[in-house]
């Protein structure tokens, strides 16, 4: 009985370790890539910055991009 419990705990530890390792190896998103569905996946020097899209005053969507931290983007006409 103790052997079964010990084996179960060891298997659980191995599976947990594999999952953590897979999360750490996940590729980060480079600059200007869309991060709407994955805001935490931008590379370390970038931040996921989101903007609302409007048409005739009504919100029609949202776009998010991996952009440099601390940089301010202004609209050009």
UniProtKB/Swiss-Prot annotation:
Organism superkingdom: Eukaryota
Subcellular location(s) per record: Secreted
Residue span(s) of the pro-peptide: 21-26
Residues of the signal peptide: 1-20
Record keywords, A-Z: Disulfide bond, Secreted, Signal, Toxin
A UniProt-annotated Pfam family: Toxin_35
GO cellular component: extracellular region
Xref: InterPro entries: Spider_toxin_CSTX_knottin
Main location as per UniProt: secreted
UniProt PTM: Contains 4 disulfide bonds.
GO molecular function: toxin activity
TM segment ranges: none
Tissue/organ expression: Expressed by the venom gland.
The family this protein is said to belong to: Belongs to the neurotoxin 19 (CSTX) family. 08 (U8-Lctx) subfamily.
Protein name, UniProt field: U8-lycotoxin-Ls1i
Taxonomic source organism: Lycosa singoriensis
